[in-house]
């Protein structure tokens, strides 16, 4: 017997769409208005800087000859499938976990789209202090990191007391 989808964590999939729209929209604006390597200062310690990432986080495996594109695409698809299954098994009222899963799925799909469409991931957020620059990243990366942090946070929060049955 199946349960109504609105009573499951799948109720939170709308957040995946929001993350995708914001992420892909920001990348579209960068691609339309920046040449590769262009930089525009936004605030002290924060630039928009168009970079291409052919690898994973911190350009891991970026110079590996192209196979990593499909490897990371497969990982993204696998993680998305697992997280959607976890959302289906969870209750809609488990907000923190479902929001975390949706953020990770949205970010993974945003970067997956880039990998499959362009062959690289569009990065544009350049955070720096003095001459030290953090790795350039994008909004999908931010969504994934926030989602992962929420999962860790949830692990430290007290669990609700189980209802006693009379």
From Swiss-Prot:
Gene Ontology biological-process annotations: proteolysis
HAMAP family xref list: LspA
Membrane topology: Multi-pass membrane protein
Pfam families cross-referenced by the UniProt entry: Peptidase_A8
Keywords on record: Aspartyl protease, Cell inner membrane, Cell membrane, Hydrolase, Membrane, Protease, Transmembrane, Transmembrane helix
Protein name per its UniProtKB record: Lipoprotein signal peptidase
Enzyme class: hydrolase
Main location group: membrane
EC number, UniProt record: 3.4.23.36
One Gene Ontology term of the molecular function aspect: aspartic-type endopeptidase activity
Catalytic residue positions: 123, 141
Metabolic or biological pathway, per its Swiss-Prot or TrEMBL entry: Protein modification; lipoprotein biosynthesis (signal peptide cleavage)
Reaction(s) this enzyme catalyzes, per UniProt: Release of signal peptides from bacterial membrane prolipoproteins. Hydrolyzes -Xaa-Yaa-Zaa-|-(S,diacylglyceryl)Cys-, in which Xaa is hydrophobic (preferably Leu), and Yaa (Ala or Ser) and Zaa (Gly or Ala) have small, neutral side chains
Record-annotated membrane-spanning stretches: 12-32, 70-90, 102-122, 137-157
Subcellular location: Cell inner membrane
InterPro entries membership: Peptidase_A8
Family stated for the protein in its record: Belongs to the peptidase A8 family.
Function as written in the Swiss-Prot or TrEMBL entry: This protein specifically catalyzes the removal of signal peptides from prolipoproteins.
Residues making up the signal peptide according to the UniProt record: none
One Gene Ontology cellular component: plasma membrane
